[in-house]
Amino acid sequence: GAYTMANALKMAHYLRTFDFEFLEEPMPQRSNNYPGYDVLREKMPLPLAGGEALDSRAAAKALIDRRAFDIIQPDASLCGGMGEVVFISELAQLSGVRCYPHCWGADIVIAATVQTLALVPDPHFGLPTDTPFLELDQSENPWREGLAKGQIEVQDGFVRVPRKPGLGITVDEELVQKYAV
């Protein structure tokens, strides 16, 4: 986020006129504490989402306890894996906070997030479709578009959970070797 608190509030009021569902991390993140976000949340006309850079369940619990966000966004690649995202989503659910796992980057992270969404305790996030929300980067990215064979496919705005073993994808070992350090 790059907004000041005042500008974030102005933007949120503007976006509300277009029926936006939430606003994600509008202010700079200076630490896992997300200073100022609990104050911002109290003034927001839209649900406030954040927590994509959380590195532990303890950091997530602190934000949930502070009510810093309406929607917590743990990322499996940063917070300790799929099991930690499920744990954090259970903590959130117990506190009345929604959980939309964050997902940005490579095929492997996308596959892990899709599998995790199938595990979260309550898929009814209050969206009109009652389906989990998957954040899916569409920018050009060789790590997302070639690292795995059998990519996660989007059809009519939906993703099916792969049924193959593991994450449901096969890693392209040649590409991994190409980028190995």
Indicate residue ranges for each PLM-predicted region.
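Alpha/beta enzyme core
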Residues: 5-22
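Shared catalytic-loop signature of beta/alpha-barrel
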Residues: 13, 19, 27-49, 53-158
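C-terminal extensions of enzymes
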Residues: 141-181
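Active-site mouth loops of central-metabolism enzymes
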Residues: 1-6, 49
